[in-house]
């Protein structure tokens, strides 16, 4: 596996976000809609003890899910991380342009409930143990990361979640039409149109989930192609 191929992805994403600031559209992902319901249901069941639900979003991209969480829930506060400075700049602009009016029941704006940070998760997660109620990431785990890097990342997610915290992530799976198409990078990573994707089967999900209890795995289709995803819900033991 050529590490250079993996490392060059950050610049490729930077350029893509700069040239296509709405490349994923404005509507939230179906996975984010599902995650919001799960996070709020945990609060209702008193799994989350604080008044707010503090979640961290990894690989937030251009913020379509970040802003959805903040604008459509009186409970959820989001810390959004992405290694692209263009992505974080875009989220911050949306906060100012569209989400700064105080529309929440507590007098806050949706923008008040979003914190952003430029950060590469290959370097860990820069927060203390037991900080967050939940974690959400849409197709981050299936980016240009090796299996060992994904295992390390999931251990970091486990560390920053509070006991009983929920981790919800999506990955493209080996039934996807792009699997084994394009340039083989190594493991189950393939490059198409400049983007590297790590494809998952359920065995790999189990492999990276040793610290968690897997509560749910279901399949979701996204887009017209479509991308074929697993949506995984884990709970910190």
Model-derived segments and their meaning:
Residues 1-124, 167-237:
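Class I (Rossmann-like) S-adenosyl-L-methionine-dependent methyltransferase catalytic domain
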Residues 85, 147-151:
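Non-membrane alpha-helical structural segments and their capping/turn regions in soluble enzymes
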Residues 122-135:
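A short acidic, Gly/Pro-enriched loop at the edge of an enzyme's catalytic core
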Residues 131, 164-165:
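Surface-exposed loop/turn positions
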Residues 134-148:
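A short SAM/SAH-binding and catalytic strip from SAM-dependent methyltransferases
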Residues 145, 162, 210:
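Short conserved AdoMet
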Residues 151-163:
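A short glycine-rich, Lys/Arg-flanked "PGG" loop and its adjoining helix->strand segment in the class I
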């Amino acid at each position: 596996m050529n590490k250079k191929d993996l490392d060059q992805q950050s610049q490729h994403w930077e350029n893509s976000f700069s040239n296509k600031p709405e490349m994923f559209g404005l509507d939230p992902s179906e996975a984010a809609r599902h995650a919001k319901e799960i996070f709020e249901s945990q609060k209702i069941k008193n799994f989350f003890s604080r008044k707010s639900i503090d979640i961290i979003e990894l690989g937030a991209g251009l913020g379509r899910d970040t802003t959805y969480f903040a604008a459509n829930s009186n409970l959820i506060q989001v810390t959004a991380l992405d290694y692209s400075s263009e992505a974080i700049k875009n989220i911050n602009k949306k906060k100012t342009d569209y989400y700064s009016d105080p529309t929440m029941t507590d007098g806050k704006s949706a923008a008040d409930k979003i914190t952003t940070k430029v950060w590469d998760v290959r370097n860990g997660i820069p927060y203390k143990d037991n900080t967050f109620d939940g974690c959400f990431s849409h197709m981050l785990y299936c980016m240009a990361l090796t299996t060992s890097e994904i295992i390390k990342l999931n251990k970091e997610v486990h560390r920053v979640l509070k006991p009983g915290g929920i981790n919800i992530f999506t990955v493209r799976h080996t039934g996807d039409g792009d699997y084994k198409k394009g340039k083989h990078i190594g493991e189950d990573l393939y490059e198409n149109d400049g983007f590297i994707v790590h494809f998952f089967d359920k065995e790999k999900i189990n492999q990276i989930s040793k610290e968690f209890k897997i509560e749910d795995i279901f399949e979701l289709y996204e887009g017209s192609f479509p991308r074929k995803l697993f949506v995984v819900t884990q709970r910190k033991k």
